[in-house]
Amino acid sequence: MKNPMLRIALHEIRQILREPRFLLPFLFPPVLLILSQMTLLSAEMPPEILSRMMLFCALLISPMTVPLASDSFAGERERSSLELLLLLPVRPSAIFYGKLLALLPVPLVLVVLSETAYAFFSGCFLFSLWWKSVFAGFLACFCFSGISLFVSLSVKTARAANQISLVFVFILMIAFAALSDFYFRISWAPFLLALFVFALFSAVSAVSFRKFRNG
């Protein structure tokens, strides 16, 4: 593969998949939610409750991009390997966007798998609820990844990056929950939310890259 950005992204993804401490937070929330569905809740739920539970399942996974993003740059700086990374014979943009690209595949795949599993075990698969929940999970992953990456570039340790990023995650989780009724009720709401999230993600990514390039 000749594209350096894709090579860096694939290397980062392989590192993520080799690290159980990064994978376990992605796996536990949907498993626990599905088990609670099977043991505590009734098999048949009204669509209103099911939509909230499926959205909750997606939102439990998406913040797990925070430790990945925190380790991307703050972790590299803490291990004194960021300077070595910048000495690679590739453009800074390839390093930055390769690392950014590597943050998304694992959580996005797990959002789809967990939402599908939850819908299956709930005994009430409604495609309209499924795709909207998956889409909300995707948007939350992009949102949390962009903000966490910016924080990771602004602090010196991965722990500090995690702690600061979780404040933003808490605020955004409240916003997603508050808008859930509007999101599921209005047909064009997902597309409006997508425009906002991708505009935010693009702006934060551009500012983060400038910060990375300027050191």
Language-model region placement:
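A structural motif at transmembrane helix-loop-helix junctions in multipass membrane proteins
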Residues: 138-170
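Selective transmembrane-helix segments that form parts of the transport pathway or gating/packing helices
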Residues: 90-120
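N-terminal Sec/SRP start-transfer signal
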Residues: 1-22, 213-215
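Transmembrane helix boundary and interhelical loop/hinge segments in multi-pass membrane proteins
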Residues: 16, 50-52, 66-86, 100
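Membrane-interfacial helix-loop-helix connectors in multipass membrane proteins
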Residues: 40-51, 114-138, 142, 185
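Junction motif at the cytosolic side of a transmembrane helix
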Residues: 154, 198-215
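Extracellular/periplasmic helix-loop-helix junctions in multi-pass membrane proteins
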Residues: 178-194
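Hydrophobic alpha-helical transmembrane segments of multi-pass membrane transport/permease proteins
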Residues: 15-42, 52-66, 108, 165-178, ...
